[in-house]
C-alpha cells in the first residue's frame, strides 16, 4: 500500500469565552504568531453552520504602557468584535464556546498567475492527491495507491497517524504546503522561492 496523504484542516481559532459586552475571547488552533492576528477579519461559525464576520481587536496603542507597545500581544488580550453589545446578543446569533473561527480571506487570481488566498497548506496538497489518482486511474500498478485526506495536522498530525495505523502502508507520501522563504531570507539562504517549486 502506498498512502498518498494531504490534510484538509487549516489553522484557525476557537471561541473560549463570550464576555458580558459580547466581545469574544478565543484560543488558537495550530501555529500562530500573535503579532499577525490583530485587525484581521474572521468568520465565526454558529451553531446552525452559518458564519458571522468579526474583526480581531486589541488594546489601542495610546492606551498601552511602553512595555506593552514593545512586546507581542498575549492571545488573552485579543478579542473578536462581531458587532453586538451583549453576551445574550452573541448567543442569540448562535455563537457558543467551542465554535470554530477561521480567517476571512477571498481567493484572488492575479494577472501574473499568482493566486492569493488562505489554507493553501494544504488544500493544494489535496488537489495534488486527486490529480495523481486521476493520472494513474486504470494503470496496472504493482502497488495499491490509497488517497487520504487527513485532518488535525495543524494540531499534531493526528489524522495521518490514524490513517497510517489503519492502512499500515509500506510507503507514505505526504503532499504538504510549505512557505516560500524568499520574502525574508537572503538570496544565498533561500530554499523555497515563489513560482520555482522545490
Question: What function would you assign to each model-found segment?
Answer:
Residues 1-198:
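N-terminal hydrophobic/helix-forming segments and targeting peptides
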Amino acid at each position: 500500500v502506498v498512502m498518498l496523504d494531504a490534510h484538509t484542516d487549516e489553522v484557525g481559532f476557537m471561541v473560549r469565552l463570550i464576555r458580558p459586552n459580547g466581545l469574544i475571547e478565543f484560543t488558537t488552533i495550530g501555529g500562530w504568531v500573535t503579532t499577525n492576528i490583530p485587525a484581521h477579519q474572521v468568520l465565526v461559525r454558529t451553531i446552525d453552520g452559518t458564519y458571522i464576520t468579526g474583526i480581531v481587536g486589541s488594546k489601542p496603542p495610546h492606551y498601552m504602557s511602553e512595555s506593552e507597545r514593545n512586546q507581542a500581544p498575549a492571545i488573552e488580550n485579543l478579542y473578536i468584535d462581531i458587532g453586538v453589545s451583549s453576551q445574550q446578543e452573541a448567543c442569540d446569533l448562535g455563537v457558543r464556546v467551542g465554535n470554530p473561527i477561521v480567517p476571512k480571506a477571498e481567493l484572488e487570481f492575479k494577472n501574473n498567475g499568482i493566486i492569493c488566498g488562505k489554507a493553501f497548506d494544504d488544500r493544494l496538497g489535496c488537489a495534488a492527491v486527486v490529480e495523481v489518482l486521476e493520472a494513474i486511474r486504470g494503470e496496472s500498478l504493482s502497488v495499491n495507491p490509497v488517497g487520504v485526506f487527513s485532518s488535525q495536522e495543524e494540531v499534531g498530525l493526528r489524522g495521518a497517524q490514524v490513517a497510517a495505523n489503519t492502512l499500515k502502508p509500506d510507503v507514505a507520501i505526504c503532499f504538504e504546503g510549505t512557505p516560500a522563504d524568499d520574502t525574508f531570507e537572503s538570496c544565498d539562504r533561500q530554499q523555497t522561492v515563489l513560482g520555482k517549486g522545490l
